[in-house]
């Protein structure tokens, strides 16, 4: 039985030698759709744009007509997923100050699909930095970005209690005796760089400051914290590995940390190779092939966790990578800003030189090698570092992920789980309410001012030794709370010694009569001077 062309039923005898395939083939077939019958590209684009417009309109209506009174106000934005990403990413401080002027210290903005609740000012610093671990955490925010760079078993790739133990190990490796030894090492490293670098050949010249200071700070950190073997390996190959590993801090990796982008492939290869380098150094030390030293690697080799388990060599290696990577950006960028400001204000450079003559020179006017107790006499040098950290902290935003409903003190608002909370110590450090004329670089503002620290009643032990909560201050260049930077003392010392050595050897001024310092580049994870950032130097 079948259908005729006219649609009538046709009976076919079972024994009839009819080829069913031939019969079916003889039936009319519908021709395939031609290209002209398909939707045009213009139609598809128009449809896509229509959907986007509909989403944008719905998003605008929701913001204007149906705000959630139980949550902080939301910064107006056109598109629901993109939110304020473009304006925030272009200049975070400009965005935060503008939003603060309109909404107050507490507000929410949308950043690539995530709601970010901002709390500014001293109260905001305390709110975010002193949040309980059960209420908010850093691991889920920074883990995707940092874990592939730092490696397994350290920092955000482990429970917070283990991280606190690791911070304790590193902190107690930065003893006063260790800092005393670091001064000479740092000074010699800077002097040797000046003698050997092509950038400082002759009586005068011009340098692009950021790459020069990046090299100097990685050399000083390596010799002081990492040991002579690591310093000796800072060749072109190691520098290339560092560069590839540093590429893992690309902002896109907050969202796509394991995507097969070229920079991620290079990151993973560099992490493995760098870890193998450290493991080889540790193996040689355990075999007694290298004389005992007092650096961080030797210290960590003798440490054990609370459960009695010695730190595995792989974790020591990853901790050393973390120390190298985590501190390098801030030190390099701050050292660059110091040089740029001294070139912009040459009289301040001369004040620094005169301070060394007044405090350290012998009866013949000769300056001795630096030591920890002599560096501590250089108050203006210390003020230069503090003031530069105040104005140019490399990390403009610090976030945590909210895990349970979080009431905002002194408001009727609650931050829901899934939001990120954001503190920006740089906003309070550059606000008129805390610092007079905050946009002016003025080291002398610290002549009679001390860094506000909490009193003894505010001391707390997060698991790595008693420390100030350090959050009720407008000046927090190294963060606060349980995640406060433990390398703070070394960072200050490193920057002060580098500054002292550079001032001893050179005078600085701007190129071609340029006024002021370059702008800030916010295109990477760590803000830095826009390049080229050139200055003139002249030997004393």
From Swiss-Prot:
Origin: domain of life: Eukaryota
Transmembrane segments: 41-61
An example molecular function term from Gene Ontology annotations: heme binding
Catalyzed chemical reaction(s): a 14alpha-methyl steroid + 3 reduced [NADPH--hemoprotein reductase] + 3 O2 = a Delta(14) steroid + formate + 3 oxidized [NADPH--hemoprotein reductase] + 4 H2O + 4 H(+); a 14alpha-methyl steroid + reduced [NADPH--hemoprotein reductase] + O2 = a 14alpha-hydroxymethyl steroid + oxidized [NADPH--hemoprotein reductase] + H2O + H(+); a 14alpha-hydroxymethyl steroid + reduced [NADPH--hemoprotein reductase] + O2 = a 14alpha-formyl steroid + oxidized [NADPH--hemoprotein reductase] + 2 H2O + H(+); a 14alpha-formyl steroid + reduced [NADPH--hemoprotein reductase] + O2 = a Delta(14) steroid + formate + oxidized [NADPH--hemoprotein reductase] + H2O + 2 H(+)
Pfam families registered for this protein in UniProt: p450
Keywords, sorted A to Z: Heme, Iron, Lipid biosynthesis, Lipid metabolism, Membrane, Metal-binding, Monooxygenase, Oxidoreductase, Steroid biosynthesis, Steroid metabolism, Sterol biosynthesis, Sterol metabolism, Transmembrane, Transmembrane helix
Ligand binding (heme): 485
Listed pathway(s): Steroid biosynthesis; sterol biosynthesis
InterPro entries, sorted: CYP450_sterol_14alpha_dmase, Cyt_P450, Cyt_P450_CS, Cyt_P450_E_grp-IV, Cyt_P450_sf
EC identifiers of the protein: 1.14.14.154
Swiss-Prot/TrEMBL cofactor(s): heme
Keyword Calcium: no
Example GO BP: sterol biosynthetic process
Principal location listed in the UniProt entry: membrane
Family: Belongs to the cytochrome P450 family.
Protein name: Sterol 14-alpha demethylase
The organism's taxonomic lineage, starting at the top: Eukaryota, Fungi, Dikarya, Ascomycota, Pezizomycotina
